Amino acid sequence: MKQYLDLLKHITETGVAKGDRTGTGTRSVFGYQMRFNLEEGFPLVTTKKLHLKSIVYELLWFLNGDTNNQYLKEHGVRIWDEWATETGDLGPIYGRQWVAWEKPNGDTINQIEEVIQTLKKNPNSRRMLVSAWNPADLPDESMSPQENVKQGRMALATCHAFFQFYVANGKLSCQLYQRSADTFLGVPFNIASYALLTHMIAQQTDLEVGEFVWTGGDVHLYNNTLEQAELQMSRTPYALPKLKIKRKPPSIFDYEFDDFEIEGYESHPHIKAVVSV
């Protein structure tokens, strides 16, 4: 994926040194956009091998409204382990905000369902957004993730904050705004996850896929991933794979892991890096 390699190059060549919450330090740029035509292939990075199982199971977990790490661990996915409490709780993170955003009266809003219904009834609407950024639930940066959860807050502040859908010529496009972007470890997962979600919602609303647009705010490489980024930039991308969805479930909330197949995924070897907590 040339777009992603161009981003790595942009950060390494123009990024500024900044401190951060984790204490690791970053090289950072502010504001960047990548566009992916989903008709041309599924945007899964090929210059290092990605753990596709983690991407799919995490998305299904979000859609289930689940905020406990146990489901992921049962399926061999460990990407949230560092932030969870001893019982697996992560507080009101993405899944809660997506499908059970709490109103002042205690009722909840299923933002995903509302978007799908709007796509079916009024696809020209400019209000087809989902927000996971809820200031009332953000963690206190002076506390550990686990301490925040025990006080009813998110373990980790929302990074991929909100996304919007757009329909033109019978094609569904999605734009994500990611306020904080760990470009080496996180962004490849986020691109694939939201591209997958766009395919799923397109299927549910009888639309074709259009573009996935990724927009980043503080877009950075942690200092402990700079060498890995250089290695990745030295590799030549392979052709993008294709996504096959084997069946159309009754609703967006009924997909299962085995419903998805990635055809023709060829990649360079995995590049190991340590996540900054």
UniProtKB/Swiss-Prot annotation:
Enzyme Commission number(s) from the entry: 2.1.1.45
Any one Pfam family match given in the protein's UniProt record, by short name: Thymidylat_synt
Residues that coordinate or bind (6R)-5,10-methylene-5,6,7,8-tetrahydrofolate: 51, 182, 276
Enzyme class: transferase
GO terms, molecular function: thymidylate synthase activity
Domain of life: Bacteria
Catalytic activity: dUMP + (6R)-5,10-methylene-5,6,7,8-tetrahydrofolate = 7,8-dihydrofolate + dTMP
Gene Ontology, cellular component aspect: cytosol
Entry keyword set: Cytoplasm, Methyltransferase, Nucleotide biosynthesis, Transferase
SUPFAM superfamilies to which the protein is assigned, alphabetical: Thymidylate synthase/dCMP hydroxymethylase
Keyword Cytoplasm: yes
Pathways per UniProt: Pyrimidine metabolism; dTTP biosynthesis
GO BP annotations, alphabetical order: dTMP biosynthetic process; dTTP biosynthetic process; methylation
Parts forming coiled coils: none
Positions annotated as active site in the UniProt record: 159 (nucleophile)
Function as written in the Swiss-Prot or TrEMBL entry: Catalyzes the reductive methylation of 2'-deoxyuridine-5'-monophosphate (dUMP) to 2'-deoxythymidine-5'-monophosphate (dTMP) while utilizing 5,10-methylenetetrahydrofolate (mTHF) as the methyl donor and reductant in the reaction, yielding dihydrofolate (DHF) as a by-product. This enzymatic reaction provides an intracellular de novo source of dTMP, an essential precursor for DNA biosynthesis.
Membership in a protein family: Belongs to the thymidylate synthase family. Bacterial-type ThyA subfamily.
Subunit relationships: Homodimer.
Name the record gives this protein: Thymidylate synthase
Annotated source species: Hydrogenovibrio crunogenus (strain DSM 25203 / XCL-2)
